[in-house]
Structures are given as structure tokens and as C-alpha cells.
Amino acid sequence: MADLLFEIGAEEIPAGFVPGALRQLEDDLAKALADARLAHGEVRSVGTPRRLAVWARDVAPKQTDARTEAFGPPVAQAYDAEGKPTPAATGFARSQGVEVSALVRAQTPKGERVAVTKVEKGRRAEQVLPALLERLVGGLRFRKAMRSRFDEATFARPVRWMVALLGGRPLKVRHGEVTSGKVTYGHRFLAPKAIALKGTPDDYLAKLRRAHVLADPVERRAALLAELARAGKEAAGKVREDPALVEQVLYLVEEPTAVVGEFEKSNLELPPEVVISEMRNHQRYFAVVDGKGRLKNRFVAVSATRVKDPAVARHGYERVLRARLADARFFFEEDRKRKLHERIEDLGRRTFQAKLGSELDRAQRIGAVASALARALGKDALVADLLEASRLAKVDLNTGMVGEFPELQGTMGAHYARLEGLKPEIADAIEDHYKPIGAAEELPRSDLGALVAVADRLHSLVGIIGVGEKATGAADPFGLRRAAIGILRIVIARGYHLSLAAAVEQTLDALSGVKLAAGRALVAEQVLDFLRGRVRAAWTERFDADLVEAVLAAGSDDVVDARRRLEALADAKARPDFGSLAVAFKRVANIQEKAGGSGAAAVDPALLRDAAEKDLLAALEKVEQEVVARRAARDYPAVLRTVATLEPAVARFFDGVLVMAEDPALRANRLGLMRRVAALFSDLADFRKIQAEAPAQARAG
């Protein structure tokens, strides 16, 4: 057994490319070794901006032998009556490269046939691996790649060297004009000389560490966090937590060195988000806060190298930030010269979408939709504030600050609203209507912000789909999936019992002046299908797919209600008696469907002949009122517990009663009994879609 080590050294790879490339390397090498029949131990990747490396421990010295069996014609066609090979047999043997005497008889699902077993002897690992590694590096995919000057080889950035070692012995691997060897290189400035490697992962990591390269991202992250903690103390505070920035900086440096810098205190008069955004998004600096979380006029930059005089690096970082903050202060002061209300009409000169009009049109429609949603929820008292918040929600798009810092849209509008003395709830709604930005981000804080946020997303979703634009495959240029997920997260989190169909119709009302690409009814159905698809995708990440399908089939117009039904059903499925319950109710639903699905649920007690059907009616009458009351209260766990008490009576009914009796009166009566049972659970879930079996003892009984 020997360790395989493979490193690709390159010019600086963009930070966002490195994590994905390392995952690809690890997954692809493990699969390639398995496909090549080379046994191995741990496969792991490490990397920095200048190198991507992967290793496999304990690689077998040779491939395992491969046995393959090829089947030919039926025996009856392969041999004549005297047992001599026919042309069919000799032709098959020739096609397989063997003598006809090597053919054997084999039983197959298609009868007895002639066959040949071939053994491919395994080759030595060093014969197999060079081509395997060339495919590995050539198969790496990046969002953008550069082509070699001399051939068709591509990579994220020009490849400068490669290392390919098996048990310390070099393998010859080519990519473009680069051929692998056994030397790597340390830090570009601190240790640029060639480093000879022995070929083990531990030797590789140790030698690079001495050459100022922490190749393992886990080790480098620990070093980065330690540097940030040290620098925070030096700055008389602590570094503001920012996991996303840590992850980004992690792949910008090979050995992190933190540098503390300072900016003018007067810049703390700017909104904190402006200063933080300038530092993190434009310069990759970490903000420093005091013990109460307030921003200090200090920052921490992470350098990719060490300089003899740290003051030189510090002054460079400070100079760049000073200029950027001066620009921010200028935009802030200029923006404050005009009130938000004075900027509303400016939105009319800013296009939202060519077929949907201006941002002013958008703001007015958002207000109309938000007001309709509020009335549907019985929150009429919010309408005036909703209209005001909707008018102002997009106004900051025309400010200099948002032009310079697009990521602060909403945030700046809220700051300006507070500075102008507008109602705090309005200011919060301006900021919150962009939330949630991502699938796990925070939600709006109030009904005001939540309703404007939902209305904004509904307008985009219905409007964009309405004019014929859609999300297809991985492409979603208008963020429709994100909008749909945002709607669902807000509605469920705030417990809004909204009809999605009605909300879509209200949005179409607001879009009445827009020319739709299809009929209104078709657009509405397309939007609802899109929303249902997002519901299904989101819920199947947490719940069993069959339960999700069962609940959605029973109705998903009110997603809050559907989510509660799903949670109750998931809890019920975890109980040992659920299989019997699901099977019994599935039979009820199937019989109802076969009988036509509709019809009277009336039951005439005088027509009940068997004890089992009488017992079932008695059990029904005992629980029906309780189920109705529990269902009205949306207490679905209680509904399921109560309905579950019917399972023994339903099981006895099916064991002893023929529902589809020849007597029409008996048949109709028994179908009516089934419909009454189905009425208790049919609006909870379609049990026919649930994958469940009765326990073995129940089936045996």
C-alpha cells in the first residue's frame, strides 16, 4: 500500500472557486479510484489560492482483476443435434476473441444460453494513475476558466506546477504544457524556493507549514480566527462576528496575518451599516466593536504576507479606506438634502421591468396588494401605514448612497426615514421588506414589514410570470424562486391563513394595466404551480416525500394550514400504530374513488345488517362532533388521535362486510358509511399517497 499525493499549483485562484474545486477533487478522485478498481483508504483535499491538492492513503499496488460474462445465443441455436457448434456459436466466440471450446452453458432469465467468462488482469497502480489524474485535473469545472496558450487545456488560472507522487515515486502527469514532478513551492514572497516532497500527506503539510503555507483549510481557519482574536484585543475591542467574511478571507491567503488599522472618528456619524459595508464588501476588512456591540473607529485587515514594518501595511489599508469613507460621507450628506417624499416621483423615471413599467408603478401596485392582504387577514387598521410604507419602500434606489452601495437598499431608506422623524414602524418596514434575503436569513419584524415584503414578492412573481418570463433549469435571472421561498417563509412564520389563489388574483387585479402573455386564468395557474413547486421542494428537505404529497393533494391553498397538517401527520407516522391506520384509511379512499368519489354520505341504520357495520356507525357517531370541533380549531394532532380510534372498527368492517353488495340499497348505504369515514380525514391528507403497511401481526390477524 502507498499514499497517492496530487497537487495542482497555479496563479491566484479566485477565493469563491476554491471550496467547490476541492469538493470536486475529493469526490472525483474517490470515484475514479473505485471505477479503476484500485482499493484505497482516506481521500481528502486541501488547498489555498495558489494550490489545490488531494490525496488517497493506502492505495493498492495493482487493480483487482475484473471478471466479465458475455451471453450469446440460446444453447438450442448454438449446437446442432449432434452437439457440434453451429455458425451462431462460432460467430459469438469469434466476436469475444475466444476459441469456441471456451464457451460454457449458463442459465439466464431468458433460458439456457452459451456464455464466455473473461478475466481482465489488473494493471499496476503506476500504470493506471497518470491517465486517471490527467482526467481528474481536466474534469475540474469553474464558473470561468482560462485556456492555455499552447493547447486546449483549461483551468481557473494558469497552472504553474504539478506534483504527482505514489509512495514517494513520481508519476508523469501532463496538463497543457506542465508536467508533474516531485517539488512544490512555498509562500510566494516568504519562501518561494522549490521544496522536495517525500509523498506522504503529513510530509506535504509539514513542509508547506515551514514554508509559510497552511495548506489545510481547517488549520488555516483556526490560525485566522486566532489572529482576529489577537487583533481585536490590540484594537481594544473585539472583531465583529462575520462567518461569511471569514470563509472568503480564508481562501485569499496562504498564511493569515492580521493588521489593525484606524479611521477618523467622525466617520462613526455615518450609519454603521455604511461603514461596515465599505469595509467588508469592498475591502475585506473586519469591523471592530466594543463590549456593547457598538462600532469602533478601528478595523482589522488580513494580509497575505508579512512585511518588515507593519506600519507600512497599516498605512496602506487606512489610506484606501479613508478615501472610500470620504465618498460615502459625501453621498450621505447629499442624499439628506432631499426628503424621501420628494423623491417618490423620481421612481417614475426608473424602469423596474420593460413590460411592467417603472419603479413608481411597482410601488403603487405593492401598496394595493399589501392593502388587499391586510383586509383578507382582518388587519384593516394597517392599511394607511401599508400604503405609506409601500410608497417609500423603493425610494432609496435613487439615492447616491444606494447607487454606491447597492447592498444597502432598504437599509438607507430606513435610516433616512428615521432621521426625518417618520414613524418608526414605517422606517422598519422600509428596511424589512427586503427580508428574507436568503433561505435562512432573518424575517421582517412586524406585520407592516411582512405584508409589504409579501406584496413586493407577489408583484414580482405574478408580474414576471405574467409577461412570459420564467425560471428555467438553473437560470432564474429575476429571482423568482427566491421570491416564492420568501413569501412562504414569511406567511408560515407569521401564521397568516391566506388563500394563495386569492392573493394571486389580488395581485393580478393590481396588474390590470399590464398586457399579459397569456389569459388571466392561465397566468394564475402558472403562478400557483410555481408556488406549489417551491412548497414541495422546501418541505421534502425535512419531511418524508409521501407525506408531503399526501398533504398537498388534500389542499395547499392555505400553506400555514397545510404545514400544520404535515407536522401532525409526521408525528403520527412515528407511532407504531400508524401503519394500520394508514392502510385502513387508504382502503376507504380507494373504495370511495372506485365508487365515483361523490354521492350522499347518508346512512340508514335500518339497512345495517352486519354487526361490523353497526359498530362502525356507532364509533363514527361517537367521534364526529369532536373531530369537527378539533378541525375547526386546526388542532390536527388531536384530529388524528381521535380519527385513529376508528381504525379497529374500520378494519373489522373490511374483514366482515362486502361494501359493493349486489343489493343496490345495501351498496349505497355502505358507500355512504365509507363517505362519512372519509369525510373525517380527506381534508387532512390523501392517505392513498402514503407509503405504509400494517404491522405483521395485524396482517396475520
From Swiss-Prot:
Protein's GO biological process: arginyl-tRNA aminoacylation; glycyl-tRNA aminoacylation
Reaction(s) catalysed (UniProt annotation): tRNA(Gly) + glycine + ATP = glycyl-tRNA(Gly) + AMP + diphosphate
Entry keyword Transcription regulation: no
Cell location: Cytoplasm
E.C. number(s) listed in UniProt: 6.1.1.14
Coiled-coil features, chain-numbered ranges: none
GO cellular component, one term: cytosol
Pfam family, one: tRNA_synt_2f
Entry keywords, A to Z: Aminoacyl-tRNA synthetase, ATP-binding, Cytoplasm, Ligase, Nucleotide-binding, Protein biosynthesis
GO MF assignments: arginine-tRNA ligase activity; ATP binding; glycine-tRNA ligase activity
Assembly and binders: Tetramer of two alpha and two beta subunits.
Family note: Belongs to the class-II aminoacyl-tRNA synthetase family.
Name of this chain's protein: Glycine--tRNA ligase beta subunit
Organism: Anaeromyxobacter sp. (strain K)
Gene name tied to this protein: glyS
